Amino acid sequence: EKDWRDQPIAVEAKGLTITYPGHLMQPDFKAVDGIDFTIHRSEVLGLVGESGSGKSTTGRAIAGLQKVSGGSLNVLGIEMNGVKERDFKPKRADIGFVFQDPGSSFNPLMTIAENVAEPLIVHKKFSSVSDARKYVGDLLEMVQLPRAYMNRFPHELSGGQRQRASLARALALKPSLLIADEPTSALDVSVQAKVLELFKKLQAEIGFACLFITHDLAVVDMLAD
């Protein structure tokens, strides 16, 4: 098995600072204040902290969803401090994101297949619907969901099943970097363990770099390098 320490760096932060501008009489708020970290390809880095400690903000900055105020953040070879959207856009397909509540990130009016296929359609990966459907079925099987679930709607799945589908969507474009923001905190403990086992298995097979955000040290013990 290849050691991630020998792998190239996927993400590197040096003195990373992210400030939310204050409104009216409120001073600016430093959500992230001068942090340093490195994530190699194939490495899982656990980011632990209380809520409000800037964990999610850091994840959003790596995904290009939040501006960097100071220091340096290099993501897949692109400096995010002052980045132009046109320069970062080609990298977007290479970054997957799993949110805390898959319910809110899925369109309730679309089937699971349509939700999972969304990034494939946005990035024009398949020319025919039948090819896309077959691939989505493969993705669902990869996250241990029956193909028959393709035609179900998000509300017809349990929380754990929705999070599996969310993981399938995040991995649809075969990203080299995955940001998982508290992906199991809304699930029951027994379900949580199963989803984490699956995550661990997929990470070992696919070898994506990952920032795993959580407030739970037990989760980090299980997953992080």
Task: For each feature predicted by the language model, list its residue ranges.
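Conserved ABC transporter NBD signature motif
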Residues: 71-79, 91
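Helix-to-loop junction immediately C-terminal to a conserved catalytic motif
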Residues: 63
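Hydrophobic anchor residue at the start of the ABC signature
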Residues: 116, 167, 195
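A short, proline-enriched helix->beta-strand linker immediately N-terminal to the Walker B motif
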Residues: 172-176
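Conserved ABC ATPase "signature" region
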Residues: 130-148
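Conserved ABC ATPase signature
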Residues: 153-157, 161
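The feature captures the beta-strand-to-loop junction immediately N-terminal to the Walker
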Residues: 48-49
